[in-house]
């Protein structure tokens, strides 16, 4: 039996509630981990088993209906991901997927009506369990609703990829499952109602009372819930367009997005059993893959450390950056060029070994800018300015007046040391030399330089435009001014910066 020793168990507590107008009582299941809103409800193995027991208890009471709600401000914010890194073999991952499916399906297959009273944030498996219920009320005070799993290298693995598109259609499902996570967006209650995720909205002050009354009206046949008609003729076209967008933006760098897209396509014609079986297999693949493990690591850093970074020097020590140099002109370097130019609004110059590579890198940036204009995300005046900020050369002397130079070359220590040996002779003594290395020693990289104190790790996660984490790595001789500058630049780039030593 799969267990998570770190799980903060969200218990499912059952009480029978008298509802005016009904002969039988309603069974109200409340999700509550016993802590305040700062530690939200989540589903780990023990939490799922608690919900399973609660559904059994509720069903045995022969209620008029079963309703699921959460503790104050929080419905449920998803799976307890603290246990994911502890899964060591695929069989455990499959077991976790099947457990969630089995428990949630009991709400979908219930002989009595089931309702989700979404009183607060409902994310990930929190929204998935609500989708298994026959009806959903949502508080106008709910902070967020969504399926953000793709952003952390996973998929909606407990029915979301199959239920949502068949509830609101392929366009809305693609937005919630793919587009929103990759742009760090969620649904607000009004939008959830407009899309058909929520059947009705109520104000927070009397949310539970109004939800119970509304549910009674549904049970008695006094209230009819109309659902949007699903246009299956446009399903394939919507997903074809979504795949094009993913390929253009991510270049295959996010396997979870491709898995989610495949599951959305399957949801058009597959039975629910076949669809959820495919979900389990996809979830297991991703849990055991490098992408989800790296993404979960990054997510943990952002949640625990980026919000309260420790060891960051006084920001007054940071030097002003008026020009950025990038060594390399490949895909990563080109993504960095676009990010620096867009956020810092300073000249950015790329270099590489030959002009063809340089030209390709600059063309990539210009092409991305053109796409933003065509999609209405940028006006032509801003685009023209941005294009003018990015240039390239095979001559590294263009770095002479750069305040911040970052390398994105081959992941080899000798290669990177050679790069810095060349660059150090060109730039000013206090220019920051940043490395995007993911695994090499910053200290070793700087060891032979005249000014090792201005070398710092500046590690982005790919794709650069999507993932918020930025690891700033302090070498043994990195000084406070360099470190402060790195954090200041990271903040301007709108990244969540964490200090790594």
Predicted regions, residues:
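Glycine-rich beta-to-alpha active-site loop
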Residues: 101, 106-152, 156, 328-331
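Amphipathic alpha-helical segments at domain termini/boundaries
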Residues: 1-30, 128, 173-282, 293, ...
